[in-house]
Amino acid sequence: MYIRDLDVRDFRSWPELTLRLKPGITLFVGRNGFGKTNIVEAIGYTAHLSSHRVAHDAPLVRQGAHNARISATAVNQGRELTAHLLIKPHAANQAQINRTRLKSPRELLGVVKTVLFSPEDLSLVRGEPAARRQYLDDIIASRTPRLAGVKADYDKVLKQRNALLKSASPSLRRGYSDSDGASALATLDVWDTQLSSLGAQVIQARLALVDELRELIPAAYAGLAPESRPAAIDYKSTVDISDREVIEAMMLTELATKRQREIERGISLVGPHRDDLVLNLGTSPAKGFASHGETWSYAISLRLAEFNLLRQDGTDPILILDDVFAELDAKRREKLVRLAAGAEQVLITAAVDEDLPGNLQPIERFTVTVRDTDEGRISEIAPYTAGGDEDD
């Protein structure tokens, strides 16, 4: 798979951007803050409907604009599809495939597939469980878009259930002693049923994915850090997952067991939103025990496994390397260069030439600069000219 055409309007620092891209390696070089990452962020957004840098869409819309637009034409084994996205910071986003308006942007999932390496990946190892859950859920959504809808529905039910636990806390505490308490408990029962049904599907999908990653991640890590302790992964849940066929029933049982604690605390304590992808080195958790180099190796291993898994499904995802070479030693750089050499399309950003491995063989190269205008600083792009000064 590769992106042939990219058209962006009012996305971050780009009032407009039109690019014709080719298979192979494309470089975007420019100083930090000039907007090169915004280009690959736009492509990544079409793949995941979210940014790897921010949690909400508002920062994606250029200051002073009402919305942002992204159009990306993906070519996959000779078949062309154009994904169109209208990003609205204060309303529901809209999406099209070619000329067909979609009911939900989620219907775009799978049209563009990317695997992105970035400095933010360190949070997969060092950060909170939410980052690791998102890692799993993004892969699941890319491979099985229907399950993205299940996860979205779960999040909605979870939000409603938490709102009930907080707003109706006095009634819930009184229980069946009065009509308000009985009504609140009946409503909570409804949310429990929905949460368990949807949550079981999310957990089962994650467990199936972890089973596939269980060999891929340690193998990738061993290739990067052969002298380190062996890597191992597992899935930790708030629910007994020993019998996958009865996860829904186990969720209901656990919700009943913890109901009083949930009422007291005003939050939902059971479900996949509390789970974690456990990353170990030897017998120790990687978080807190891995060195800086081991942390980078583990983060890269997670992305390598993701890339290989999507490739096994029959499609080479677009490989995005966003400002990562500057952070890596020679061995890890070489591993990524070998991966890049075998991918159908690779998009690389770097601040300066010195950050790039010498054995990269780009097909195209662009220089990203900025210009100050009455509406603020905007990004501009031009094909690289040998001998030019990229800092001008």
Curated annotation (Swiss-Prot):
Gene3D superfamilies: P-loop containing nucleotide triphosphate hydrolases, RecF/RecN/SMC, N-terminal domain. One of its GO terms (molecular function) is ATP binding. One of its GO terms (cellular component) is cytoplasm. One of its GO terms (biological process) is DNA replication. PROSITE patterns: RECF_1 (PS00617), RECF_2 (PS00618). Keywords: ATP-binding, Cytoplasm, DNA damage, DNA repair, DNA replication, DNA-binding, Nucleotide-binding, SOS response. ATP binds at residues 30-37. It is found in: Cytoplasm. The keyword Cytoplasm applies. InterPro entries: DNA-binding_RecF, DNA-binding_RecF_CS, P-loop_NTPase, RecF/RecN/SMC_N, RecF_2. The RecF protein is involved in DNA metabolism; it is required for DNA replication and normal SOS inducibility. RecF binds preferentially to single-stranded, linear DNA. It also seems to bind ATP. PANTHER family: DNA REPLICATION AND REPAIR PROTEIN RECF. Belongs to the RecF family. This is DNA replication and repair protein RecF. It comes from Corynebacterium aurimucosum (strain ATCC 700975 / DSM 44827 / CIP 107346 / CN-1) (Corynebacterium nigricans). The lineage of its organism: Bacteria, Bacillati, Actinomycetota, Actinomycetes, Mycobacteriales.
